[in-house]
Amino acid sequence: CIRDRTSQVDERVRGKELPDDVFQESLEYILAHEIGHCLGLMHNMAASDAFPVDSLRSATFTQRYGTTPSIMDYARFNYVAQPEDGITQLTPKIGTYDKHAINWGYRWLDVQDPHEELPTLNAWLREHENDPEYWYGEQSREGIDPRSQSEDLSNDAVLASTYGLKNLRRIIPHVTDWTSEEGKLQYEGGRLLMAIVFQWLAYADHVKTNV
C-alpha cells in the first residue's frame, strides 16, 4: 500500500524493490503500533480526524506530528501530500493521544486504595475533553461515526480523497515504467494497478460514510 499512496512524492518507492531505509521507516511505525497494543492500547480510528488537510500538506507540520495524533490509528501513509509540498515525513508518529493514554494508564499515584485515583484520572480526562487530539474512536465496520474510519486522513474526507485521487492519476501512467523488467511477466505492475483500484475504492468509501 505504500506505493499507491506515496510514490507521487517519494521516488524511493518507485522501483521494483523497496530500499532498506523505507523498510526501516515502516518497521519503526509498525513496531510502535504493536507495542502500543502490548501496553493495552486499542485502535483509535478517530485520531486522524484531529488534523486538517492543510496541515497534512505542510512539511514542517508533518515532520513534527506525522499523519495523526495516535500511532494506534490506521493512518499509515500521507496520501494527501502533493509533489509540490516537499513532504518527507509520510508515516505516523507517537502522538498526543498515545502519550496521554499511557500517562493515564500507567502514571504512579501514591495512594493506598485504587479508588482514590479516580478524581485525578477523571480530572485528566476533563482537562482535554474538547481537544480532538485526545479523542478516542473505536474500530468499526459499520461506519456509524465518519470520524472513526480505517485508513483515512484528516477531518475532511472529501478534500483528502480529492487529493488522493489526484495522486492516483499521477501514478497510473508510470505503473509499467516503475515496475517492469525486460523479459519477465508484469507481476509487480499488476499488483500496483490492483492496489490503485482498491485505494480508489477506499477513497470513495471514506466519502460515502459521511453521507
Model-based region annotation:
Residues 48-211:
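Conserved catalytic/binding loops enriched for acidic/polar residues
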Residues 1-4:
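Conserved small/polar residues in nucleotide/adenosyl-binding loops
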Residues 11-31:
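Short pre-active-site segment immediately N-terminal to the catalytic Zn-binding motif
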Residues 29-44:
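Active-site recognition of the HExxH zinc-binding catalytic motif
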Residues 6-9:
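A solvent-exposed, charged loop/short amphipathic helix patch at secondary-structure junctions
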